[in-house]
A protein has these predicted regions:
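Bacterial N-terminal signal peptides
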Residues: 8-18
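Acidic/polar, glycine-enriched structural segments that form the non-catalytic walls/loops
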Residues: 20-63, 161-185, 244-245, 251-252, ...
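Catalytic cores of carbohydrate-active enzymes
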Residues: 25-48, 65-66, 103-106, 189-198, ...
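The feature captures the catalytic groove of carbohydrate-active enzymes
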Residues: 54-62, 70, 111, 115-146, ...
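Short, solvent-exposed loop/turn and secondary-structure capping segments
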Residues: 76, 85-89, 105-106, 462-469
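Cell-envelope and extracellular/periplasmic
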Residues: 441-486
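Bacterial N-terminal signal peptides that target proteins for export
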Residues: 1-8
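Alpha-helical support elements that line or immediately flank enzyme active sites
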Residues: 69-100, 301-313, 369-391
Length: 486
């Protein structure tokens, strides 16, 4: 706890006041103070930066660097790794880009890859990146969008726009980003619905029901349209438009984005139930007719849709309330719960996809924290802070970051899970940024006022007696910023 001296901008006599003056007029001031003084946030941030500094693979259970994971901790990696190492990671995915523009799911040291296993991944090799072997999980449609989003984060945080002109195998990064998005329009776009497609999975998951492993499209695949893939595309287009040097790209993709947003609302949003439908099936459903899939509420896809600007504030509030209700019904710990209700036993041939197992109802901070991002960005600060806290507490309890959790809070999957570390850091930073800027004024603007209290003082300094009617505006002080006391 910090103990900072009182600072006054105008000399004058005053009595001790409470830390925020009349906090009853603005409850958000209490939330602001709690965020700024929360030691758990600082602890988790330090832990997250430490584990990301130890590598770029997804976690200790994975040998690969996955693009959908790296997309969620690249900003933390930029804090703790040399710039060249971050660039090389991004570049590696472009080295393995297919002729049609597709992006691989992940890559690993070629010496550790079993290239000849007929039951394993179908590896892709690159003459310009021979030290690695890459592969693509074909049931999911978020690799291209994840890479575009990751490059966007790198450029925005580093301000290194010149990176977009880096040439990889004869094409610039900017050109390759455009081709990655175009691949989705050429190979995954369904003209009837005006949306992109993929295999049947559980929300944002990458396991299809029709195979014991379930990571590759085959003759048994049931093709679908879902909210997660399409919301990720809307986000990626927004990102690409913002940083593209060639303005023709912006004009081209803006019209595509508008059509996608219209068609998402038209075909995937159930206005009566106030939720996204799980799937639009293009060649039948893999699930029995006795199972009403439309009762399933997808938490992760809904969170990404919020980030993509697809829901109104009223709909966001309803979605958050629905998630909290689902958490209670599932006896889970956080809104990282992937869905409720789950798919019944036997719905997936992969034995790990039992009810409340893995992506079928597991509790994933990796997506729950993205809902925190969306709440914060849309002004639901109190809700975001309260719903983030159990995620932070769980990390401390387990002394580390984990891939997912059972409803009872048991850690499962990969340990040292960098995706969880990354999304929590962004959630923390988003709330801190709000708190630091909420009603903040410059020292110049505050001239003529006085500072009575600094955040971080002991309670004895914060709970004085008596009333004081100041002649000038009164401010609170915290780490170089001033805030009106009432």
């Amino acid at each position: 706890m910090k103990h900072t001296k009182f600072i006054t901008l105008t000399v004058g006599m005053f009595f001790a006041l409470s830390s925020f003056g009349n906090t009853s007029e603005d409850p958000l001031k209490i939330v602001q103070k709690s965020i700024l003084e929360d030691p758990l946030m600082e602890q988790i941030s330090r832990m997250a930066h430490h584990i990301v500094s130890t590598g770029l693979n997804a976690g200790d259970g994975y040998g690969e660097v996955w693009i959908r994971d790296f997309n969620t901790f690249i900003q933390v990696a930029m804090d703790v790794m040399p710039d060249q190492q971050v660039q090389e990671c991004l570049n590696t995915f472009f080295h393995f880009q297919g002729e049609g523009g597709d992006i691989v799911d992940g890559y690993m040291d070629i010496r550790k890859a079993n290239l000849n296993d007929p039951e394993g991944y179908r590896y892709r090799l690159s003459e310009t990146c021979p030290q690695y072997a890459a592969h693509k999980n074909t049931v999911e449609t978020d690799h291209e969008t994840s890479l575009v989003q990751a490059v966007y984060q790198y450029v925005k945080k580093s301000q290194n726009t010149a990176y977009l002109q880096t040439v990889i195998n004869g094409k610039t990064v900017e050109q390759r980003m455009n081709e990655a998005l175009q691949y989705l329009m050429n190979e995954k776009f369904n003209k009837q619905y005006g949306l992109i497609t993929g295999a049947t999975t559980a929300d944002w998951g990458d396991v299809q029901p029709e195979h014991p492993w379930g990571v590759a499209i085959d003759d048994n695949t049931h093709y679908t349209i879902d909210i997660y893939d399409n919301a990720m595309l809307v986000l990626a287009i927004d990102n690409f438009k913002e940083i593209a040097i060639n303005k023709a790209y912006g004009e081209k993709w803006e019209s595509v984005k508008k059509q996608l947003m219209t068609n998402i609302r038209k075909h995937l949003w159930d206005s009566q139930r106030q939720k996204f439908i799980p799937h639009i099936y293009l060649n039948g459903s893999p699930f029995p007719e006795t199972f009403d899939e439309n009762q399933v509420y997808y938490h992760g896809g809904t969170a990404v849709a919020i980030l993509a600007g697809l829901l109104t504030k009223e709909e966001i509030a309803h979605a958050n309330q629905r998630m909290l209700e689902n958490v209670e019904k599932a006896h889970a710990q956080t809104i990282g719960l992937t869905m409720y209700p789950t798919y019944p036993t036997g719905s997936f041939q992969n034995v790990g996809m039992h009810p409340y197992g893995y992506q079928n109802g597991g509790d994933w901070t990796w997506f729950g924290a993205r809902m925190i991002w969306g709440l914060t960005e849309n002004g639901f600060i109190k809700e975001a802070y309260e719903e983030l806290k159990p995620m932070l507490e769980r990390v401390v309890k387990n002394n580390g970051f984990n891939e997912w959790y059972t409803p009872a809070g048991e850690s499962k999957g990969s340990g040292t899970f960098r995706g969880e570390a990354g999304v929590l850091c962004r959630a923390i930073e988003g709330l801190r940024k709000w708190a630091e800027n909420y009603q903040s004024v410059s020292v110049e603007e505050a001239q003529g006022g006085m500072v009575l209290f600094t955040f971080g003082q002991s309670n004895s300094a914060n709970h004085g007696i008596g009333k004081y009617q100041p002649e000038h505006q009164v401010y609170n002080y915290f780490e170089g910023r001033l805030y009106p006391s009432s």
